Amino acid sequence: MSSKCDVVVVGGGISGMAAAKLLHDSGLNVIVLEARDRVGGRTYTVRNQQVKYVDLGGSYVGPTQNRILRLSKELGLETYKVNEVERLIHYVKGKSYPFRGPLPPVRNPITFLDLNNLWRTVDDMGREIPSDAPWKAPLAEQWDQMTMKELLDKLCWTESSKQLATLFVNLCVTAETHEVSALWFLWYVKQCGGTTRIISTTNGGQERKFVGGSGQVTERIKDLLGDRVKLERPVVHIDQTGENVLVETLNHEVYEAKYVISAIPPVLGMKIHFSPPLPMMRNQLITRVPLGSVIKCIVYYKEPFWRHKDYCGSMIIEGEEAPIAYTLDDSKPDGSCAAIIGFILAHKARKLARLTKEERLKKLCDLYAKVLGSKEALNPVHYEEKNWCEEQYSAGCYTTYFPPGIMTQYGRVLRQPVGRIYFAGTETATHWSGYMEGAVEAGERAAREILHAMGKIPEDEIWQSEPESVDVPAKPITTTFLERHLPSVPGLLRLIGLTAIFSATALGYLAHKRGLLVRV
């Protein structure tokens, strides 16, 4: 006996729940099937006496992320700003350098030129890539055959620049530079608003968090949908051979629907049997796009001692020996539950996963004591962590990445419906893909695709722009005249070379005119 509905949504993360809410609000009968014993997907808010609440998964929102801001406001949630009042720290080669702004200042003029050219070039290349179709970029094939390591080797002339750029890639996509396609990474940064927007706290992707935790987004939608959300229901079979679509779960329940939305990471499609089989390109796509590797770590202290030293808690930490590459203050908005959140990224996550939780905590505290110059870092009162690599219904975090050669070959089928199955998930977004914002965009777009298929809305209403948030307005990202026009290192060398040639020629001419050159 099967349960009948209009639409089955596979996956109760933000994307699936946003899709379900829109369909429900449109008058459709929708059922959400979630594999875990909770909703939220890659967002996960834990609550206990020591921390009140803590986001162990996706957490940050900021300017230009207007869909998640609109949805959360509709659900009654509020945001607060992540602390960045005091100074940040750049830790490199065993020394701490305090600074203010999104990126650490550079003291070596050659390194400054090198980094300035790198950020400028990454943004310039991104502008050539269509957000909705990166495979259509003029040089898509060439860039997709290149790893980010190869691109950085071409662009960076100094080792300092290359190391900071590598950290930037690790932090943005939780993968190594040799693992990801240059085309895909350039697209990823572009659709997040560029290098400054994606990395910044103030006026950037990490500006805010939700009071009470991001897990409330899906929890409150679940409250609205009631028993239409079914937990602990991993989907194992989707059958489109009949008049309606039959969706079977691991516990042998069958749900019958007119349409299905798959709101899970593409690779998790391999856990589902499809009848008829998936088309060739979709079938191969889902075997080729892994997720990144990250362990999210939150260390709690008696008080935010770093603020007493005029540090805000944000640290950019270079070096292979450092377990953490990036931190932020994770204290509550009222100052309680003082905490520093850090990210163990990419290969370091895989390496340090072998240690015990206690061993990881000790490494973190030792590192923070060095970077902050304070033994108070050695005295935590509590510790929370989440290794997303071991989650069988996520397969990693933050998001899916594309290795070289995959985007141009398979990217165009990422959002392409398969019969009556439509695809959501943050990976399918065109703006802030990889973030909660992208999850909302994708879920609502997939829902409107079904509304269009049912004849309820015209095709031109499937994709909709979003008005800017009144509560979290965006400031434009600006660059100085020098940042726009300073030469790269090779440009400077060419300039010096041309200047030397011109000077030598001029001196030779003057010497000749004055009879100083003697013919031998």
Curated annotation (Swiss-Prot):
Its membrane topology: Single-pass type IV membrane protein
Membrane-traversing stretches: 490-516
Pfam families (alphabetical): Amino_oxidase
GO cellular component: mitochondrial outer membrane; mitochondrion
Molecular function per GO: flavin adenine dinucleotide binding; monoamine oxidase activity; primary methylamine oxidase activity
Residues bearing PTM S-8alpha-FAD cysteine: 397
Superkingdom in the source lineage: Eukaryota
Positions of modified residues (N-acetylserine): 2
Catalytic activity line of the entry: a secondary aliphatic amine + O2 + H2O = a primary amine + an aldehyde + H2O2; (R)-adrenaline + O2 + H2O = (R)-3,4-dihydroxymandelaldehyde + methylamine + H2O2; a primary methyl amine + O2 + H2O = an aldehyde + H2O2 + NH4(+); benzylamine + O2 + H2O = benzaldehyde + H2O2 + NH4(+)
Site description Important for catalytic activity, residues in chain: 156, 365, 382
Predominant location category: mitochondrion
Modified residues (N6-acetyllysine): 52
Subcellular localization: Mitochondrion outer membrane
Keywords: Acetylation, FAD, Flavoprotein, Membrane, Mitochondrion, Mitochondrion outer membrane, Oxidoreductase, Transmembrane, Transmembrane helix
Residues on Cytoplasmic side: 2-489
Required cofactor names: FAD
InterPro entries, per the entry: Amino_oxidase (IPR002937), FAD/NAD-bd_sf (IPR036188), Flavin_amine_oxidase (IPR001613), Flavin_MAO (IPR050703)
Stretches in topological domain Mitochondrial intermembrane: 517-520
Membership in a protein family: Belongs to the flavin monoamine oxidase family.
Protein's job: Catalyzes the oxidative deamination of primary and some secondary amines such as neurotransmitters, and exogenous amines including the tertiary amine, neurotoxin 1-methyl-4-phenyl-1,2,3,6-tetrahydropyridine (MPTP), with concomitant reduction of oxygen to hydrogen peroxide and participates in the metabolism of neuroactive and vasoactive amines in the central nervous system and peripheral tissues. Preferentially degrades benzylamine and phenylethylamine.
Subunit structure: Monomer, homo- or heterodimer (containing two subunits of similar size). Each subunit contains a covalently bound flavin. Enzymatically active as monomer.
Protein name: Amine oxidase [flavin-containing] B
Organism: Sus scrofa
Lineage: Eukaryota, Metazoa, Chordata, Craniata, Vertebrata
